[in-house]
Amino acid sequence: MKIAIMGSGAVGAYVGARLQAAGADVTFVARGAHGQAMQKQGLQIIMPGLDLHLPQVHAIDHPSALEPVDLVVFAVKLTDAMAAAESLKPVLRPDTRVLTLQNGIDSVSMLSEALPQAQIRGGTIYVSAVIEAPGVIKSPGGFHRVVADAAKGDPVMQALAALGERCEALDVALADDVARIIWEKFIGLSAFSGCTTLLRARIGDILSHPESTAFLQQLVEESVAVAQAAGQTVPAQMVDNYMKNLRAAPPSFRSSMSEDLERGKALELPWLSGRVHQLGQSLGVPTPAHTAVYRALVLYAKGQA
């Protein structure tokens, strides 16, 4: 199976590395020092008990050099999504599928503005990883999973699932109700990203104080309320279960958005707390905590030069 990774940052590179190790022919679209390092020395995954070193990977710095592929795994930050989609458009074959693994609930509709909607498949991903150094991805471990739209038996998605059965340290599943799963991730991620970014804190510090813990839980509750008002069915114990999962997470756990703020990069804020705020306004659901996050961080949303 021929796969391109569009957006080979920490998450994209991790997924691509595991798929290549399972036998896929993978092309990584990666820019800058990270992409150059991959071209020269391959790609390394550092993970407790599950290290992986691929001495040779095919890395290109622009999709214009992309050969025909069966699947594009679209893992670009939402801040760069439209530009990346436009750059992909000229080389996209009619039989190629584009699997978006981006955050938020809007990626399929966003990409549909630039790419044929019939070729786009929704999905979501659960991976904890950072770029430790150019060409080196570090993960603390844990459960890493891709969930993709089954798309009524689409053979490309079936091939991805079959490939996933051979993957180590990456579970690949297909779902008929992927929209629900995307919403469930959005509920938790919007709260977690908003809280860790606004407070400039890791989850262990947040949960060590009752007031910051209450703020995090309020964010989750608001996300649930908005989802329900939007017509989504949310598990009855979702708030309690999500808070329980965060208490079991490594104390150093924090969101990529908090890291982006620290580095002066553009933030996915408009598609996370900003989206909860917008939905709350349109649906008549109060979202004071998410509104506070959005308004407090909006000046940093485009990054700092």
Q: Each predicted region: which residue ranges?
A:
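Nucleotide donor/acceptor-binding cores
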Residues: M1, D70, T96, F143-H144
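NAD(P)-dependent Rossmann-like dehydrogenase/reductase catalytic/cofactor-binding core
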Residues: Q217-A305
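Rossmann-like NAD(P)(H) cofactor-binding subdomain of soluble oxidoreductases
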Residues: L52-V136
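Active-site-proximal catalytic alpha-helix in oxidoreductases
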Residues: A179-L207, E211-V224
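Rossmann-fold dinucleotide-binding core
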Residues: L101-K185, A191
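Generic preference for hydrophobic
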Residues: F28, A59-I60, A148
